[in-house]
């Protein structure tokens, strides 16, 4: 891995776990390889991500991307997670081989399902 940040997240991943009683959960499979991510998130009454866990069945780039995502999302309002993660991804994606970029972005795809569930529940 060329990115020092992604390498750090791969070697010392953050949030690689399953939350037993999450507020939301999503499973996402890559459309280009066999990587799978299962994400569980606990959101408090104010809409803040209080805990996030990700199980990754895939390559090192998926693991690093999930760890980066988890560390960026923790303690952030659900509504703001995508923008914050986008800024972090923009900084590292140029150093990721073209064929692995979707692996790094896979956690964001899983979180989009969680976000839609959150918005749907909030608008009831």
Where are the model-predicted features located?
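Domain-level signature for proteins that mediate thiol-based redox and metal-cofactor handling
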Residues: 1-124
């Amino acid at each position: 891995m060329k990115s020092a940040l992604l390498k750090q997240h791969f070697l010392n991943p953050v949030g690689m776990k399953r939350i037993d009683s999450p507020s939301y959960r999503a499973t996402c499979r890559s459309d280009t390889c066999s990587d799978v991510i299962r994400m569980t998130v606990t959101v408090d009454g104010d809409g803040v991500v209080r805990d996030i866990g990700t199980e990754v069945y895939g390559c090192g780039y998926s693991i690093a991307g999930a760890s980066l995502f988890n560390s960026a999302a923790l303690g952030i309002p659900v509504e703001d997670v995508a923008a914050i993660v986008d800024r972090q991804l923009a900084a590292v994606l140029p150093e990721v081989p073209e064929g692995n970029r979707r692996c790094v972005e896979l956690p964001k795809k899983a979180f989009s399902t969680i976000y839609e569930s959150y918005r749907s529940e909030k608008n009831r």
